[in-house]
Amino acid sequence: LKVNTFAPFFLIKSALPYLTRSKGSVLNIGSVNAWSGEPNLLAYSISKGALMTMTRNLGDSLHRKNNVRVNQINPGWVLTEKEVERKKNHGLKHDWYKNLPNIYAPSGRILLPEEIASLATYWLSDESGPVSGQVIDLEQYPMIGRNISKDPLNLT
């Protein structure tokens, strides 16, 4: 909770005078685990759920009172260097992500960090308009009720 919930709250609180003067925008980085966490990620899922509630509340109150937008993106499974290494440590081949069954990734691949960054840039920009208090899921299948464990990944 300290990293995923308290830290964003205190960062926003500290930056609020500047954000108010600049009519700024905050983008919290959540996770689809906020909705239906994988079985082994209970504490993480709770913290991301709390962040989502905070985003919705601050997105309303700070937008009305300070003209500061607060939104959140909830990435799904992202192909980070850490994720590649983690799966290799679980005994998977170095290129495990190149042939994913559609139960894990309907498109045959998982999200790339660059795709998340592109969407984050949009939500922080003025081009995203007056939208505030929204949580946007970045996943390739409906999230509610479907978040199977990918640890360990069964590619057989």
Task: Report residues per predicted region.
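Short, small/polar-rich loop/turn modules that mediate ligand/substrate recognition or access, typified
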Residues: 64-69, 131-133
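Active-site helix of classical SDR
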Residues: 12, 47, 55
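Active-site loop-to-helix junction immediately N-terminal to the catalytic Tyr of the SDR YXXXK motif
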Residues: 37-45, 57, 86
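Short C-terminal tail/terminal secondary-structure segment
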Residues: 36, 121, 132-156
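Alpha-helical segment proximal to the catalytic Tyr-Lys
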Residues: 17, 60-64, 129
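Active-site loop immediately N-terminal to the catalytic Tyr-X3-Lys motif
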Residues: 36-42, 65, 108
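Residue(s) in the substrate-gating loop at a strand-loop-helix junction
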Residues: 31
